[in-house]
Amino acid sequence: AEAEAALQRRFAIIQVWRAIRKPIERDPLTICDARTFRAEDLITAERRYPHRVGETYRLAFSPGQEWYYFPQMTRDEALVFKVYDSDTSLDGRFTPHTSFADPTSPANAPPRESIEIRTFAFFDA
């Protein structure tokens, strides 16, 4: 009940992402500058949970999007970014992100080992 009440207020989901072993040589994380994608680039995807149905977004490519990646991230570095904000009046409510096959990665690069943690931030007003 408390969680459902909290979700009625404004909330944001903040993500922390980092390597857990060796520097990332293969499939690095890339994020899209939230100012560079258009609302029509978003594709709604339904997520089914045991007691509710939610939704997430996927992003269709558009030439105006600007993507940034972080090669060779070490376990001493972390990215912190907002992946969602429930306030629909804000620009930059989402930070689209994914990994990608970096063509400059060595052919024998080890698989990426990383961890992501998502936290919820709840606002009073």
Explain the meaning of each model-derived region.
Residues 57-125:
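Catalytic core of Fe(II)/2-oxoglutarate
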Residues 2-4, 51-54, 88-91:
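N-terminal start-of-chain detector that recognizes signal peptides
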Residues 23-80, 86:
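Double-stranded beta-helix
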Residues 1-39:
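A contiguous catalytic/ligand-binding core that recognizes phosphate-bearing ligands
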Residues 1, 11-14, 40-41, 49-50, ...:
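Short amphipathic alpha-helical surface micro-motifs
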